[in-house]
Curated annotation (Swiss-Prot):
It is found in: Nucleus. It holds the Pfam family bZIP_1. SMART domains: BRLZ (SM00338). This is bZIP transcription factor RISBZ1. It comes from Oryza sativa subsp. japonica. Residues 1-27 are annotated as: Required for transactivation activity. GO terms for cellular component: nucleus. Changing A6S: Loss of transactivation activity. Gene3D superfamilies: 1.20.5.170. InterPro entries: Basic_leucine-zipper_C, bZIP, bZIP_sf. SUPFAM superfamilies: Leucine zipper domain. GO terms for biological process: positive regulation of DNA-templated transcription; regulation of starch biosynthetic process. Homodimer. Forms heterodimers with RISBZ2/BZP33 and RISBZ3/BZP20. Interacts with DOF3/RPBF.
Length: 436
C-alpha cells in the first residue's frame, strides 16, 4: 500500500544532485548566495534577509568581511546539528537516500554591499517578500487540498498547480530540495517540481533517521480507504436507488395517464351514443312539427269557413228578428170587410209580413237580390165577390199593406215588402198562413 508522508519528511532516492555552482558575491538584495562543495545549498534572498533580520534582533555578532569586500554571515545552524546532519547523510548513503544536504560551516553567502540601508525601507521589503512567500505556501496547500478532494486523480488540475508552484520563488528555509508525490510532472508522472519548507532545516538537522510508517498509521490509512470505499459505494447505491425511483415514478405516471386516457375514451363513446339518440329524437321532432304545421294550416282554413258560415247565420237571424220587431211596433187596426156584413172582422197579429225585414234592414241583406213583384195586389176599386173568401182575404191584405205603407212613410217600403213577399211565396200561401 502506498503511504503518504509530509512534504518535509519525504526523501527521494531518484532525485538527481544539482550541478555545482561557483561561489559569487551577492550584488544586491535579490541575489542568491551559493556554496560550493559536496552538498549544494540554495536559499532564496527572502530567507537570507529574514534570517539576517532575526540575527540582528537576537544580537548575533556582525558578519566578517571577506577578502573581496563582501560580508560573510556565520552559519545559523549549530555545529552539533551540522555534524549530526552530516553523520545521518553518511550513515544512509548506502541506501541511496538523498535526505538532507550537509550545511557547510564556512563560505556562507555574501551579504549585500549596501548594508547600511534605511530600516523602514528594509522592513517594507522584508514584509513584501514575506507576503510573497506566504502566498506561495497557500497555493501549495491549495494544491494538496485539490489532491485530497479528487480521489480519482485529476492530473490536469495537479499539473496546473505544479506549474504554478514551479514558477513561484522558493519559500524561506535552508533550500533543501524535496521531491513531492502530489505535484506530477508535465507528462503525468513525478517531475522535478520543488517545494520548500520553512522549518525543514531544523527537523532534518535534528532527525537521525528517516521516518518509518507505524502500524497504527497503516490501520488508519486502511480505515480511511475503507471509509472512502464505503462512501463511494453509498453514493453508487444512492444513484442506483434514485434511478430506480425515477423509473418507478415514470411507470406509475404512464399507468395513470393510460387509465385516464381509457376513461376519456369511454366517456367519448357514451357521448357519441347520446348524441346519435338526440339527433334521432330531433329528426322525429322536426317531422312532427312539420305535420303539425300542415294540420294547423288546414284547421285555420276550416275556422275561416266556419266563421263565414256563422256570419251568414247571424245576418239571417238579424233579418228575421228585425221584421218581427217592426210588426210588433204597428198598432192593431180594424178594417171594414163589407158594407153588407153585420159584424167586423178583427185583424190578427200573425201577419205573414212579420217574417220579412223592414226597409231600414234591406241594405244589410246584401246577398239577396231584389226582384220585381210578380203580381199586383188587387185594387180596392175592383169589384169583389162578397161570397168568395179568397177575394175577401186579398182585400184585407191590400188594406193592411196600404196602412203599413202609410205608417212607414213611403212607397218604396211597400214595393220592397211586395217584392220580398212575391219572391218568397205567392198569394195563396199568404192566405193559408193567415188562416192558420
Amino acid at each position: 500500500m502506498e503511504h503518504v508522508f509530509a512534504v518535509d519528511e519525504i526523501p527521494d532516492p531518484l532525485w538527481a544532485p544539482p550541478p555545482p555552482v561557483q561561489p559569487a558575491a551577492a550584488a544586491g538584495v535579490d541575489d542568491v548566495g551559493a556554496v560550493s562543495g559536496g552538498g549544494l545549498l540554495e536559499r532564496c534572498p527572502s530567507g537570507w534577509n529574514l534570517e539576517r533580520f532575526l540575527e540582528e534582533l537576537d544580537g548575533v555578532p556582525a558578519p566578517a568581511a571577506s577578502p573581496d569586500g563582501a560580508a560573510i554571515y556565520p552559519s545559523p545552524m549549530p555545529a552539533a546539528a551540522a555534524e549530526a546532519a552530516a553523520r545521518w547523510s553518511r550513515g544512509y548513503g548506502d541506501r541511496e537516500a538523498v535526505g538532507v544536504m550537509p550545511m557547510p560551516a564556512a563560505a556562507l553567502p555574501a551579504a549585500p554591499a549596501s548594508a547600511a540601508m534605511d530600516p523602514v525601507e528594509y522592513n517594507a521589503m522584508l514584509k513584501r517578500k514575506l507576503d510573497e512567500d506566504l502566498a506561495t505556501v497557500a497555493m501549495w496547500r491549495a494544491s494538496g487540498a485539490i489532491h485530497s478532494e479528487s480521489p480519482l486523480g485529476n492530473k490536469t488540475s495537479l499539473s496546473i498547480v505544479g506549474s504554478i508552484l514551479s514558477s513561484q520563488k522558493c519559500i524561506e528555509g535552508n533550500g533543501i530540495l524535496v521531491q513531492t508525490k502530489l505535484s506530477p510532472g508535465p507528462n503525468g508522472g513525478s517531475g522535478p517540481y520543488v517545494n520548500q519548507n520553512t522549518d525543514a532545516h531544523a527537523k532534518q538537522a535534528t532527525s537521525g533517521s528517516s521516518r518509518e510508517p507505524s502500524p497504527s498509521e497503516d490501520d488508519d490509512m486502511e480505515g480511511d480507504a475503507e471509509a472512502m470505499g464505503n462512501m463511494i459505494l453509498d453514493e453508487e447505491d444512492k444513484v442506483k436507488k434514485r434511478k430506480e425511483s425515477n423509473r418507478e415514478s415514470a411507470r406509475r405516471s404512464r399507468s395513470r395517464k393510460a387509465a385516464r386516457l381509457k376513461d376519456l375514451e369511454e366517456q367519448v363513446s357514451l357521448l357519441r351514443v347520446e348524441n346519435s339518440s338526440l339527433l334521432r329524437r330531433l329528426a322525429d321532432a322536426n317531422q312532427k312539427y312539420s305535420a303539425a304545421a300542415i294540420d294547423n294550416r288546414v284547421l285555420m282554413a276550416d275556422i275561416e269557413a266556419l266563421r263565414a258560415k256563422v256570419r251568414m247565420a247571424e245576418e239571417s237571424v238579424k233579418m228575421v228578428t228585425g221584421a218581427r220587431q217592426l210588426h210588433q211596433a204597428i198598432p192593431d187596426m180594424q178594417s171594414p170587410l163589407n158594407v153588407n156584413s153585420d159584424a167586423s172582422v178583427p185583424i190578427q197579429n200573425n201577419n205573414p209580413m212579420n217574417y220579412f225585414s223592414n226597409a231600414n234592414n234591406a241594405g244589410v241583406n246584401s246577398f239577396m237580390h231584389q226582384v220585381s213583384p210578380a203580381f199586383q195586389i188587387v185594387d180596392s176599386v175592383e169589384k169583389i165577390d162578397p161570397t168568395d173568401p179568397v177575394q175577401l182575404q186579398q182585400q184585407q191584405m191590400a188594406s193592411l199593406q196600404h196602412l203599413q205603407n202609410r205608417a212607414c212613410g213611403g212607397g218604396a217600403s211597400s214595393n220592397e215588402y211586395t217584392a220580398w213577399g212575391s219572391s218568397l211565396m205567392d198569394a195563396n200561401e199568404l192566405v193559408n198562413m193567415e188562416l192558420q
